[in-house]
Amino acid sequence: LQWLILDHNLLENSKIKGKVFSKLKQLKKLHINHNNLTESVGPLPKSLEDLQLTHNKITKLGSFDGLLNLTFVHLQHNQLKEDAVSAAFKGLKSLEYLDLSFNQMSKLPSGLPASLLTLYLDNNKISDIPDEYFKRFNGLQYLRLSHNELADSGIPGNSFNISSLVELDLSYNKLKNIPTVNENLENYYLEV
């Protein structure tokens, strides 16, 4: 079994028994979208590449440590705060796509892997960006921070000067000035 899709059910964490997923040694895709999960599922098999847990009620993430093939993680439309996210992704060197949009983060989470190419954090409550936060994401290409609480004072001058960045969405924030961006940027969204 390589794909397991359990979308649009009434699954709860208490009904998912022990190591049910880790026994599936060839599993590459696990989708449990639109359910009643309150925390991430696990343990998960090392073969997993794509994990989708969207439209749940997740407030807690376990560690994804050891999932060396995990490339895509979709966690949008949950109830995650930055503290729940910070430790979960440490050590993942293959993670390229992370969607944390439509959650309850007021700060950017720490500990995200430098391997990310796509990072979606739109529709949260993020109000500022720590200095040089995005500097370690050498290959970051797509960044969405629209529908947050970002204001000019919360964005250090060099925040978006990322040479690899091709798309940046800062729409629907509280910006009065246009932040500095790298000349390689192809798509820049600042709708109000």
UniProtKB/Swiss-Prot annotation:
**Which protein is depicted?**
Lumican
- Amino-acid biosynthesis as UniProt keyword: no
Location comes to: Secreted, Extracellular space, Extracellular matrix
* Record PTM: Sulfated on tyrosine residue(s).
Mention any Pfam family matching this sequence.
LRR_8
Taken from the UniProt record, the cysteine pairs bridged by disulfide bonds within this chain are: none
Q: Which InterPro entries match?
A: Leu-rich_rpt, Leu-rich_rpt_typical-subtyp, LRR_dom_sf, SLRP
By sequence similarity, the record places it as follows: Belongs to the small leucine-rich proteoglycan (SLRP) family. SLRP class II subfamily.
Q: Which UniProt keywords apply?
A: Extracellular matrix, Glycoprotein, Leucine-rich repeat, Proteoglycan, Repeat, Secreted, Sulfation
